A protein has these predicted regions:
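Alpha-helix C-terminal capping segments
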Residues: 1, 20-21, 145, 152-156
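Catalytic cores of RNA-modifying enzymes
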Residues: 1-129, 173-176
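Short, locally clustered residues in the helix-turn-helix/winged-helix DNA-binding domain
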Residues: 44, 146, 179
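Short hydrophobic "helix-edge" motifs at membrane interfaces and signal-peptide entry regions
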Residues: 48-49, 155-159
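Short secondary-structure junctions and interdomain/linker hinges
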Residues: 72, 137-140, 181
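An accessory alpha-helical subdomain
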Residues: 97, 106-113, 118-151, 158, ...
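C-terminal beta-strand-rich structural cap/linker in extracellular carbohydrate-active enzymes
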Residues: 165-181
């Protein structure tokens, strides 16, 4: 029925996308909760190959990935995932769906790669900037990014804000304000 469908059973963190198939790859899985964030970061690293991911995650991880700016759960993984993928929470899976039931709730989400696969800034600077801002999430960006390479002064419109208040577009704008890496 699905002549183009190929199923690979392997250690996702060790496999090379090139060894799986040429071209676009969609990932579907019930990921081990202890490595699910690493799986997402591998997808982000190879975003030119991974067009979509549908997976079950611990609910807290799914909430973080899908969180909007300004929410308590918005963080590094939210910004980086949303920079290249559209995040869609699909449904929650209660512990009673499993035998034995886990102590945590689960959620299934879909990540669809955006049409624009590159940002309007240096992506290494963007990633480093997001990580630096959230490493001091309770500080204003002026203090959190003090000494960040290429950014002598945080632009005034961001200076008094905290990391969780900025959208992906805001982080792109901040990265553009930085000099070359």
């Amino acid at each position: 029925r699905y002549p183009d469908l190929r199923v690979f059973e392997s250690d996702f963190l060790r496999m090379s996308p090139d060894a799986v198939a040429p071209g676009a790859i969609a990932v579907i899985g019930n990921f081990p909760y202890n490595i699910s964030t690493q799986i997402v970061f591998k997808v982000l690293e190879h975003r030119d190959r991974f067009t979509e991911l549908v997976g079950m995650f611990q609910k807290e991880v799914a909430d973080r990935l899908c969180a909007p700016p300004g929410s308590r759960t918005y963080g590094i993984s939210s910004v980086l995932a949303q920079a290249w993928y559209t995040m869609e929470p699909l449904f929650i899976v209660e512990p009673t769906a499993f035998i034995p039931p886990p102590k945590v709730r689960s959620a299934v989400i879909r990540m669809r790669r955006n049409e624009v696969t590159s940002l309007a800034c240096d992506e290494r600077v963007f990633t480093a900037l997001v990580k630096a801002a959230f490493n001091h999430r309770r500080k204003t960006l002026t203090n959190a990014l003090r000494g960040f390479p290429g950014l002598p002064v945080v632009p005034p419109k961001f200076a008094a804000l905290r990391a969780e208040r900025l959208s992906v577009a805001d982080y792109v704008e901040l990265a553009q304000a930085c000099g070359p890496p």
